[in-house]
UniProtKB/Swiss-Prot annotation:
Residues that span the membrane, as ranges: none
Protein name, as recorded: Calcium-dependent protein kinase 9
Active site annotation, chain numbering: 225
Source organism: Oryza sativa subsp. japonica
Regulation of protein activity: Activated by calcium. Autophosphorylation may play an important role in the regulation of the kinase activity.
Function: May play a role in signal transduction pathways that involve calcium as a second messenger. Functions in signal transduction pathways that positively regulate responses to drought, osmotic, and dehydration stress. Regulates expression of stress-associated genes in response to drought. Involved in tolerance to drought stress by increasing proline and soluble sugars, and improving stomatal closure. Required for pollen maturation and spikelet fertility.
């Protein structure tokens, strides 16, 4: 058994050196000397510490930390030898996470890790444990991301709206982060589940988001990825606290510092991020986008392609005329407009947002229902349209034997009664047999997404589509095959009749309302038919952004920014 380490972080001093953004605009600083460290403490009004004893390691200047240069192998001894938490948290030798916590059912999966229910063996307190296998940390960037996330979570204050990191462990195989359990569901899901949704409810949620930004900025942390999915309720009670849970893209910053790396989620990304010259004001913009969606149910900047979304963000012309904006108070609209100002210098600070009359008196915000249209929009916001589901099934049915060999074997294993279809229970039992630990809510979500005909079970095509749903649709041959399935006459377009034929139910009927919705959503040039380019844009929009890995997003957004520079949409800061 390799060495292990553990920490129960409480203050910044216990954490050690918080890592800097490894793609930061500034050059890396050399390792701090005793002189520079003392000078830094004096700038912050602290008394200089005495010179450390010989052979003792001096505490680094947090702003001069550079990410590790190690490039771990994909597995084996090289990956195990990487000390991810070295210099970030103090060591506690030979204590394993399972010594203190009993790990239970899976709660969810992320890019690097898996989160399980963790029960304190002594107190029986229920927490969440995110385990990050070292074999998944393939590059120095991956290692630096985890180090920075741990340092940031440990340095943030004990605030009711911030999930608390309770302990961090490291052994030869993985890093384990034990934190507060938030099992009350996502922000939007709770809104949809409520029978009545009002401006006052939106104000309450928006105030929590603003409090998170204020707490982060006060401690020198820029979040950089504020979005509804990163806010969970602590419990299922109606008055449960809403908490920010993900700091994977957050960075430490100093006043006046500028950043260049393009990160975040497209709908919530500030224009200056696309220009690669930004500071903490980006969090105010993202919070403003969340508030806009809370009030009307759709994002303020929308298009069917990534470049279209980016151009809409750069223009910054949000729509305040459509339903339900006419019935929303002037105070609410005033705050949203201020937060979505394209000039970051004119945006309010987090404290100014909280002091705005609409949020300062959030409990007295109008209690008039915003209408079912908002709840319906919020529900549809993250769902694929029916055409996209059908297209994924077509792709699945035309994959080569080599591409689906493993999936075919799994299908045969799960189809225990050999009737050519898999029920949800068979899916659960089969995944258990093959050692999968996919969380039950995720199984149900995939089942619902892939069950195109809604009959409660998956045939082979739908089953393979589950896998396609989780992959980036980058193979043009696959997309062309799916397009030709709909384009029966080979005209190069999918017309309304072909769309109706492809989406007809067993009786041969196609819902006109569904067809109208798909055409409105996909037919961007409004010529009454869907071109191949429009089809590809539909298939590559939305889902990719939520499922893409962090590294993939970095490269994708860099490419997007370069294309916007080339076509003159943005001008780089000098």
């Amino acid at each position: 058994m390799g060495n292990t380490c553990c920490v129960a972080p409480a203050t910044t001093d216990e954490v050690g050196a918080p890592p800097r953004d490894h793609h930061h605009a500034a050059k890396k600083s050399p390792a701090p000397s005793a002189t520079t460290t003392t000078a830094t403490r004096q700038r912050h009004g602290q008394e200089p510490k005495p010179k450390p004893k010989p052979r003792a390691r001096a505490k680094p200047n947090p702003y001069d930390w550079a990410p590790p240069r190690v490039l771990p192998a994909r597995g084996g001894a090289a990956a195990s030898a990487v000390r991810v938490l070295e210099g970030v948290v103090p060591h506690h030798p030979r204590l394993r996470v399972t010594d203190k916590y009993q790990l239970g059912r899976e709660l969810g999966r992320g890019e690097f890790g898996v989160t399980h229910l963790a029960t304190d063996r002594a107190t029986r307190e229920r927490l969440a444990c995110k385990s990050i296998p070292k074999r998944r940390l393939r590059t120095a960037v991956d290692v630096a991301d985890v180090r920075r996330e741990v340092a940031i979570m440990a340095s943030l204050p004990d605030h009711p709206a911030l999930v608390r990191l309770r302990a961090a462990y490291e052994d030869a195989d993985a890093v384990h982060l034990v934190m507060e359990l938030c099992d009350g569901g996502e922000l939007f899901d709770r809104i949809v589940a409520r029978g009545r949704y009002t401006e006052r409810a939106a104000a309450a949620a928006a105030r929590t988001v603003a409090e998170v930004v204020r707490a982060c900025h006060a401690h020198g942390v820029m979040h950089r990825d504020l979005k509804p999915e990163n806010f969970l309720y602590a419990g299922k009670a109606e008055d449960a606290q809403l908490k920010a849970i993900d700091f994977g893209l957050s960075v430490f910053f100093r006043p006046g510092e500028r950043f260049r790396e393009i990160v975040g989620s497209p709908y919530y990304m500030a224009p200056e991020v696309l220009r690669r010259d930004y500071g903490p004001e980006v969090d105010i913009w993202s919070a403003g986008v969340i508030l806009y969606i809370l009030l009307c149910g759709v994002p303020p900047f929308w298009a069917e392609t990534e470049q279209g979304v980016a151009r809409a963000i750069l223009r910054g012309a949000a729509d305040f005329d459509r339903e339900p904006w006419p019935r929303i108070s002037r105070a609410a609209k005033s705050l949203v407009r201020q937060m979505l100002d394209v000039d970051p210098r004119r945006r309010p600070t987090a404290q100014q947002v909280l002091d705005h009359p609409w949020l300062h008196h959030a409990a007295r915000a109008p209690n008039v229902p915003l209408g079912d249209v908002v709840r319906a929009r919020l529900k549809q916001f993250s769902l694929m349209n029916r055409l996209k589901k059908k297209a994924m099934r077509v792709i699945a049915e035309h994959l080569s034997v080599e591409e689906v060999e493993v999936i075919k074997d799994m299908f045969a294993l799960m189809d225990t009664d050999n009737n050519g279809r898999v029920t949800l229970q068979e899916l659960k039992d089969g995944l258990t047999k093959v050692g999968s630990k996919l969380a039950e809510p995720e199984m149900e979500l995939l089942m619902e997404a892939a069950d195109v005909d809604g009959n409660g079970y998956l045939d082979y095509g739908e089953f393979v589509a589950v896998t396609i749903h989780l992959q980036r649709l980058s193979n043009d041959n696959h997309l062309r095959t799916a397009f030709l399935f709909f384009d029966k006459d080979g005209s190069g377009y999918i017309d309304r009749a072909e769309l109706a034929d492809a989406l007809a139910d067993d009786s041969g009927h196609a819902d006109d309302a569904v067809l109208d919705h798909i055409l409105r959503e996909v037919d961007t040039d409004k010529d009454g038919r869907i071109s191949y380019e429009e089809f590809v844009a539909m298939m590559k929009s939305g889902t990719d952004w939520r499922k893409a890995s962090r590294q993939y997003s970095r490269e994708r957004f860099k490419t997007l920014s370069n294309s916007l520079i080339k076509d003159g949409s943005i001008t780089m800061a000098r």
